[in-house]
Design a protein with these regions (language model features):
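Extracytoplasmic/luminal low-complexity segments enriched in Pro/Gly and acidic/polar residues
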Residues: 89-104
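Short solvent-exposed coil/turn linkers within tandem alpha-helical repeat scaffolds
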Residues: 7-17, 44-53, 80-93
Length: 104
């Protein structure tokens, strides 16, 4: 899957972000959260939209917590709360903000 996604190219902003995020998911499955976080960050930067951005901000935040990067996680979670308050991810984001603030 990684080889196919790395070679994927699309002019569509959402598909491009989904491909980068898919690479992040693949690296999480391989227990390589550092690599996964890089791809989630790439997916976030690829295109700012209401569909993929909060999804990958959430995944990046959870991954950052796993890596012990609570401050980074807090930034991702607060961006969801502030910029994507209508997203599905925002419905439970306060709990994740609390987790990041507590350093867990």
């Amino acid at each position: 899957a990684i080889g196919h996604l790395e070679n994927f190219s699309s002019d569509d902003a959402i598909l491009g972000a989904l491909a980068k995020g898919g690479l992040g998911d693949a690296f999480m499955q391989l227990n390589q959260p550092g690599d996964a976080l890089g791809f989630y960050e790439s997916a976030i930067a690829h295109n700012n939209n209401e569909y993929t951005t909060p999804k990958f901000l959430y995944k990046a935040g959870v991954t950052a917590i796993e890596l012990g990067q609570s401050e980074k996680a807090l930034q991702y979670f607060e961006r969801i709360k502030n910029d994507f308050s209508d997203s599905d991810e925002a419905s439970t984001i306060d709990a994740f903000i609390g987790m990041a603030k507590s350093g867990n």
